[in-house]
A protein has these predicted regions:
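Bacterial N-terminal signal peptides that target proteins for export
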Residues: 1-11
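Bacterial N-terminal signal peptides
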Residues: 10-22
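Predominantly soluble domains enriched in secretory-pathway, periplasmic, or organellar proteins
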Residues: 23-396
């Protein structure tokens, strides 16, 4: 697997794109971290308990200790996404071109539903609308075989059952300005759902852009938003819309920066500008950004830098959406090698602090950080050994 295809394309986003899975301010005593791993065939997704008072994961002599049994996925599970109420979950299985569905057992572990749902070629990212009516799946395709990527849309039924909507998968339609007359074969990498309105945004690594679509709330059908194609930096690899603001951020792995946008009421994007100028705001970030996530209130944004082996933190201006990097000595922290995904979980107390987790694909470890909410300070806890080649990660 290439470095690019080895990076998580979601986040889950989210309901999101690098996928935001937090229980907000819940004081529940039961909390879990879920980790999808690619080191076996088929892959697995495993639950681990979180001690919310300490941020520690269930472990023994530095090795994660699972809750219950690991559930099997398809081959090479990448994105891992829960529904908003955390009653079922999905993995995008890049190697077997399908989606696995899971329900949650009483002990917090996952149980795989019978059968899998066929996706397009090489599904790499997942996102869901806030009402959990639709699952959006980015299929990478294979440009080397002249097979461009696209987006599959599934309606979500009882127990998380999936049914593909009419006319799915939907093409990216990259034949209009501002791209060249003959653009490169699209290579979509990530997807995010807007916090307001029925819009999704898909990054295209090959053409250096993000594409906007509206989705029909009844049928799930996709249509281009006005303008549709918005140029960003080199090799966009992650896209994220915070859960408490109508902003969009695109992290570019080739130029190591973040493009910042306001989502308009029609789904089109307007570049956020630096203070007192008309210059589009572009935030510098770590080497090879692969995933993004924020807290529930969208006070902070965190970026996993895959090649820089670190997490980089930013404050989000609640009015303008402008990102400001937190001081390096408190807001940037080292991870294990090759972080590909992020998860965040409230510590359940009244102080509002959080625990932040990274899935480190290169090191086969999980990193944990305490997030001091008043300052954005990240304090590392000991890394723990994980199953081989961990990928998607989520917390509940």
């Amino acid at each position: 697997m290439s470095i690019r295809s080895g990076w998580l394309r979601c986040v889950a986003v989210l309901w999101f794109l690098v996928f935001f899975l937090s229980c907000g301010g819940s004081s529940s005593s039961s909390a879990f971290l879920y980790l999808a791993s690619q080191g076996t065939t088929p892959g697995t997704v495993t639950a681990y308990s979180i001690d919310l008072s300490k941020g520690t994961l269930s472990s023994n002599t530095g090795q994660l200790t699972p809750v219950g049994k690991a559930a099997h996925t398809g081959t090479q599970p990448s994105a891992l996404l829960f529904n908003p109420t955390h009653t079922f979950a999905y993995t995008a299985n890049t190697g077997s071109d399908d989606i696995s569905t899971f329900t949650v057992n009483k002990d917090g572990s996952l149980a795989a539903a019978q059968g899998v749902t066929a996706a397009g070629m090489r599904p790499v990212a997942l996102a869901m609308d806030s009402s959990a009516h639709f699952l959006f799946v980015v299929n990478e395709g294979n440009p080397a075989q002249n097979v461009g990527g696209n987006v599959s849309v599934f309606s979500i039924g009882s127990g998380g059952a999936l049914a593909e909507v009419s006319n799915s998968p939907f093409p990216l339609r990259e034949t209009s300005p501002p791209l060249p007359v003959t653009p490169a074969q699209p290579l979509p990498t990530a997807v995010a759902v807007s916090n307001q309105g029925n819009f999704i945004y898909v990054t295209d690594r090959n053409n250096g852009c993000v594409l906007g679509f509206s989705f029909d709330g009844t049928s799930g059908a996709l249509s281009p938003v006005p303008g549709q194609i918005f140029i960003v930096g080199s090799a966009p690899n992650a896209v994220y819309s915070p859960p408490a603001a109508n902003f969009l951020y695109v992290a570019n792995a080739g130029s190591n920066d973040i493009y910042e946008f306001i989502i308009n009421s029609d789904g089109s994007l307007t570049a956020i500008t630096t203070v007192g100028t008309t210059t589009p705001a572009v935030a510098t970030t770590g080497n090879g950004p692969a995933a993004m996530i924020s807290d529930q209130a969208a006070k902070y944004l965190f970026v996993a830098a895959n090649q820089g082996n670190e997490v980089v933190g930013y404050t989000i201006n609640q009015v303008t959406g402008l990102l400001t990097q937190i001081a390096l000595n408190i807001g940037t922290a080292s991870t294990g090698a090759g972080p590909v995904a992020l998860a965040i979980r409230s510590n359940g107390s009244t102080n509002g602090d959080y625990w932040l987790f990274t899935s480190n694909n290169g090191a086969s470890t999980v990193s944990t950080f305490s997030l001091v909410y008043t300052t954005g300070t990240l304090n590392p806890l000991p890394q723990l050994a994980a199953p081989l080649a961990p990928y998607g990660v989520a917390a509940r």
